[in-house]
Every structure is written in C-alpha cells, then in structure tokens.
C-alpha cells in the first residue's frame, strides 16, 4: 500500500509531542492523529490510540508488520523535517 500524502497538521516546539499527522494511503484511506514524539533515542511515531477504562492505551489503527511501520515512520519523519521550521506554533 503506497503512501500518497502526509500532512503535518500541528507542530509544537514545546514538550515531547512534536506534531500531529495525517497519512493517506493510495488516495483512498486516511489515518489521522498519528503523533510525532521525541524520545530518548530520537523521534518516533505513535499511532492513534484511545484510553481504555482500566487506564491502558490501545492503538485504534496500526501497521501489522515491521516493514510497513518503518515505511510509515520514514515518510512522516521526512515530511516533519521539511516543515518543522516553517510553522512552529508555541
């Protein structure tokens, strides 16, 4: 499944969450609310999730193999690096 669009919807210079992203696949399916997070080993993505009644977070949508996760993460982080200095909202 090809990634046809990556939209960085919100960028923040403060805190560990750096951006909120939407990714479109094959111009047919979009996943909103993917987060770009700054961790101890650099930036990574967190798929959209919701909090369960017992306080645990569960992904709403996520890739089912490593290759797809890496493809999505690379596309998002490449786009984030392009736009992060253009539109910083504090």
Swiss-Prot record:
An example of a Pfam family matching this protein is: SpoVG
InterPro entries named among the record's database cross-references: SpoVG, SpoVG_sf
GO biological processes: division septum assembly; sporulation resulting in formation of a cellular spore
* Record keywords, A-Z: Cell cycle, Cell division, Septation
Presence of the UniProt keyword Lipid metabolism in the record = no
Recorded coiled-coil stretches = none
Q: Which family does it belong to?
A: Belongs to the SpoVG family.
Q: Which PANTHER family match?
A: SEPTATION PROTEIN SPOVG-RELATED (PTHR38429:SF1)
Which HAMAP family does the record associate with it? SpoVG
Q: What does the function comment of this entry state? A: Could be involved in septation.
Instruction: From the Swiss-Prot or TrEMBL record, give the protein name.
Output: Putative septation protein SpoVG
Q: Which organism is it from?
A: Clostridium perfringens (strain 13 / Type A)
């Amino acid at each position: 499944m090809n990634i046809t669009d990556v939209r960085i919807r919100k960028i923040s210079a403060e805190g560990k969450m750096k951006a909120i992203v939407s990714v479109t696949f094959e111009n047919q399916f979009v996943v909103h609310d993917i987060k770009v997070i700054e961790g101890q080993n650099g930036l990574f993505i967190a798929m959209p999730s919701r909090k369960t009644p017992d306080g645990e977070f569960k992904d709403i949508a996520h890739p089912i193999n490593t290759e797809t996760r890496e493809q999505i993460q690379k596309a998002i982080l490449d786009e984030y690096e392009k736009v992060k200095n253009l539109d910083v909202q504090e």
